[in-house]
Amino acid sequence: FERSLNRLQLDYVDLYLIHQPYGDVHGAWRAMEELQQAGKIRAIGVSNFHPDRLADLIAFNKVAPAVNQIEVNPFNQQLHAVPWNQSHGIQPEAWAPFAEGKNGLFQHPVLTAIGQKYGKSVGQVVLRWIFQRGIISLAKSVRKERMAENINILDFELSAEDMLQIAALDTATSAFFSHRDPAMVEWLTGRKLDV
């Protein structure tokens, strides 16, 4: 942690996450609690934790996660995880809100029709849908014009009907992989990272 802080040339970070729910999660969490207590981290959180893993983490530690960064997009809406997080004071944050364009997201007729109705892009419709669900979104872009477009979602509101149409797109399936698949867990935990 100190090496990362030095490379960033900072005295503290605003948010620090455990990226996957594997390994010595409780040991890592307690170390993060100590860093938060020391003022090196303002908020601590997790990524890719299902409610059962969060319940375990909360039960055996002093500080509950401030954030849980999970895959949320129109095809994987996390209809159980999002309200569970919110009811426990954990802010859901959507990674891959556009599912990296998989499943034809940017051409989907429901999303394009809603976008046309408001004069907005599919990306803006998706980000607004996430916003209206009380979820923070983490939308990656390297293009300046796309970044500006992604910010411009506060001048319209999706109707209840729009929200229901998007809700109907849910397949409850990751566009990437299952964090509960034993083969994937073995692969992830077997990787050696040079940090």
Question: Which stretches of residues belong to each language-model region?
Answer:
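CE4/NodB-like, metal-dependent polysaccharide N-deacetylase domain
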Residues: 1-17, 34-38
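Beta/alpha (TIM)-barrel catalytic core signal, keyed to glycine-rich beta->alpha loops juxtaposed to Asp/Glu
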Residues: 20-195
